[in-house]
UniProtKB/Swiss-Prot annotation:
Organism this protein belongs to: Plasmodium chabaudi chabaudi
Membership in a protein family: Belongs to the adenylosuccinate synthetase family.
Residues engaged in binding Mg(2+): 26, 53
A GO cellular component annotation in the UniProt record: cytoplasm
Record's subunit section: Homodimer.
Catalytic reaction annotation: IMP + L-aspartate + GTP = N(6)-(1,2-dicarboxyethyl)-AMP + GDP + phosphate + 2 H(+)
Additional note from the record: Parasitic protozoa lack the de novo purine biosynthesis pathway and rely exclusively on the salvage pathway for their purine nucleotide requirements.
Protein name (database record): Adenylosuccinate synthetase
Cofactor note: Binds 1 Mg(2+) ion per subunit.
Metabolic or biological pathway: Purine metabolism; AMP biosynthesis via de novo pathway; AMP from IMP: step 1/2
Keywords noted in UniProt: Cytoplasm, GTP-binding, Ligase, Magnesium, Metal-binding, Nucleotide-binding, Purine biosynthesis
Function text: Plays an important role in the salvage pathway for purine nucleotide biosynthesis. Catalyzes the first commited step in the biosynthesis of AMP from IMP.
Binding residues for IMP: 26-29, 51-54, 141, 155, 232, 247, 311
Amino acid sequence: MNIFEHNIKNVDKGNVVAIVGTQWGDEGKGKIIDMLSKYSNITCRFNGGGNAGHTICVGNKKHALHLLPCGVLYENNVNVLGNCMVIHLKTLMKEINNLGNNILDRIYISEKAHILFDIHQEIDAMQETRKSKDGNAIGTTKKGIGPCYSTKASRIGIRMGSLRNFENFKKLYTKLIDNLMELYNIKDYNKEEELNEFYTYHQILKDKIINIMLYINKSIDAKKYILIEGANAAMLDIDLGTYPFVTSSSTTIGGVFSGLGIHHKKLNLVVGVVKSYLTRVGSGPFLTEQCNEIGDYLTKKGFEYGTTTNRPRRCGWLDLPMLYYVKYINCIDIINLTKLDVLSGLKEIYICIDYKNKTTGELLEKGSYPLEEEQLREYEPVYEKFEGWDEDITNCLEFDQLPEKAKKYVLAIESYIKTPIVWIGVGPTRDHTITRKFD
């Protein structure tokens, strides 16, 4: 389905579509972004860095992308790295070289994106080790994301635009690295070697670093089809997620506008990606987590290992109060439900439909969510039980081909969140997707 050509909610068809994860990441955003990228002219990342990971299966080949938008797999697609990204250039160049096929010709990088240096990763590892000793580890990817955003907020970071003038870049680099080495008592750091690497990056990338706000807005006015790709997910948002177990950037729809420099009225459609069960990597509260054979089953059958870290993900039942909250703050128009096939073989499946206060018995107001860990401890999940199904659904091409019990599960989710589920993932590749009609 070419979503850009579809009229939504009786409004004129639009040319700007955003994809957001609705949980703690790893929902399967990469597949739907890949599917829609073949219709778009431009695919954009607006936030985050190499801590994000999209795995895309095309035939028998797997592509793991951490910085590049998924549109790089289509030759007709220009790919943009946005203002609010933090970019480790060694990782970026490795991805570009791995893909080949003149990928660089189709990439633009925001002059306002911040550069993530190796020292940021070193600091990240030091901080996580220290927190682990205190029992307060967040479970970061140690990719340097937090420290890089910290230097950005402290106004001592270096933006991509500075790399165009290498002599000026060297001065900024020396000042930043010396500052961080002194602050974190780092004795041994090879500045000369890293500067040599960055001179190579300067030569390769200087013409790819542009004012992407102007580029995107002119493209919107020219009626180009633009796909906006969210990294991480809503519940990891620095402000609206389960703080402090979050990432360091705005991952919700509000981050799009600063991340790309576009007006909110230019966004036509928001697609929320929902995994059929729930997963989380690292520390943090997880009310529906299943630390039992069910959790083990979901981990193994769903291949729930992090794209970036390869850590096994914590698994549990789908959480609808969380999903409704995320829908509320992102104005989600339609849903892509992923990995329904993983639930095949379970005798019983549960969905959390409410949070109940352990002391008062009161139910949480729909649309709200207790984001602090102490608040969440006051609640317990209220479940609705569904009968499972044994059938292999990976060859189902239409909704009506699904087992009745699987259809009932999908429709229950749709009824609760009052948002149409348009795509249903029933297997790993882009071909394993059911598309439903919607108005």
